[in-house]
Amino acid sequence: MGSKSPEGHRQTPDASNSSELKPANPNPKPARNGSQSADLDGGNLDDDNDDDGEANEEAGVKTSADSTDKKKKRKRSKKKTKKGTLPLKQSSPPRVLVSSLFPSGYPIGECVPYQDDNTSRTTDEELRYNSRLWDKDFLDEYRQAAEIHRQVRQYAQNELIKPGASLTTIAEGIEDGVRALSGHQGLEPGDGFKAGMGFPTGLCLNNVAAHWTPNPGAKDVFLDKSDVLKVDFGVHVNGRIVDSAFTVAFDHTYDNLLTAVKEATNTGIMHAGIDARVSEIGAAIQEVMESYEVEIAGKTHPVKAIRNITGHDILRYNIHGGKQVPFIKNDRPDKMEEGEVFAIETFGSTGRGVLHDDVGLCLSNVFSKANAPQVGVYGYGRNTDVSGANLRLSSAKNLLKTIDANFGSLVFCRRYLERLGVEKYHLGMRHLIDNGIVEYYEPLVDVKGSYTAQFEHTILLHNGGKEVISRGDDY
């Protein structure tokens, strides 16, 4: 989920959370990418060892009768084991808990060494100290969230995202999958804090680059074979948010646009690391992305890196932390630090490369005195720095209680409120926004007729390398 630049509509980082981000094992195991290819990793090792043991035992058998008896016993034992074994394959639609698919631990993301790593920068004593800080729960939660993201997006790519599909159906299919695989439906107060959606599913078409989701009261939109669709959704487990996005185009006309943005994102990942300057990362990303061009209807369009939306760090329960990672040349002094989590994302456009809030999509009368439904607003986020103690409007007080009990600082949308059974909340929401208690996100668009693309991954900055936690076989 892109962070709007300049500063605006960002969740205020909770400084107390940042200390919880601990560096991981400096020597991680090799990466296991993808979802289906990794599904069987958690359950097959014991069966193989049993077969080997049985083969050795069989080699010492002296009579055929004994051999027959032992084979029968082995067969009965094997059947009993199979009967009690949990499913080792995901269903379609995805409904099998990932915790049951990976009882021995979740797949590690793609592990990438830092560029030009100075091994003398960290002493042996520091390495021993850092290894003691390794937070296994932190890693397990992040890897579980990443596996949920991989499996749900694979289902979306294979079954949901097709010409003629309703964007509401796609969004709800993704979100139902995330909730089912995490084991938390989020319908009871506090349940949404345990696991579930990190933010609403973004489904942005063509010149709409970011922050659009289908909402109640709006006319449903159907996917056309000529569309370029950005799919951006987050999964969290215990507040550890995995933020990852991809773009789908059915027409090969846009292949270069998608390739440019995907390569730009991978360039950002390659340059990211401990002590890396965001200014240098942005310059490298822009150079790669703007080396591409796209021919549309006989006219050549250079791919432009979008200037006023950025990547960002991620804090616990806060999708946008205090650091931004632009994907253009810049003079920001910020550096990445060990133990931090970043969403490395890039957006490319065939248009101007500058986004603006679309009042047409958001409705110009959203905040009029008529208090019309906010049909086009993407989502809302609780500003945890502002108290609601002085609220006088009862509808605003009740709505704030619902927000605090179910979402906290996680971004939510109107669909999520209505899923909880909340009604007649528009006046209360308006009051919360006017008092700075809730912030809102509008759709961000480039010029009409242009096309935009997005790719994004979440990375963890370990001591000995970065883990691209959301990497899969697809991107």
Swiss-Prot record:
Residues reported in the UniProt entry to bind substrate: 211, 320
Cofactor note (record): Binds 2 divalent metal cations per subunit. Has a high-affinity and a low affinity metal-binding site. The true nature of the physiological cofactor is under debate. The enzyme is active with cobalt, zinc, manganese or divalent iron ions. Most likely, methionine aminopeptidases function as mononuclear Fe(2+)-metalloproteases under physiological conditions, and the catalytically relevant metal-binding site has been assigned to the histidine-containing high-affinity site.
Species of provenance: Aspergillus niger (strain ATCC MYA-4892 / CBS 513.88 / FGSC A1513)
Protein name: Methionine aminopeptidase 2-1
List of residues binding a divalent metal cation 2: 243, 312, 345, 456
Gene Ontology MF, one: initiator methionyl aminopeptidase activity
A cellular component annotation (GO) from this entry: cytoplasm
PANTHER family from the UniProt entry: METHIONINE AMINOPEPTIDASE 2, METHIONINE AMINOPEPTIDASE 2-2
Pfam families: Peptidase_M24
Domain of life: Eukaryota
Keywords, comma-separated and alphabetical: Aminopeptidase, Cytoplasm, Hydrolase, Metal-binding, Protease
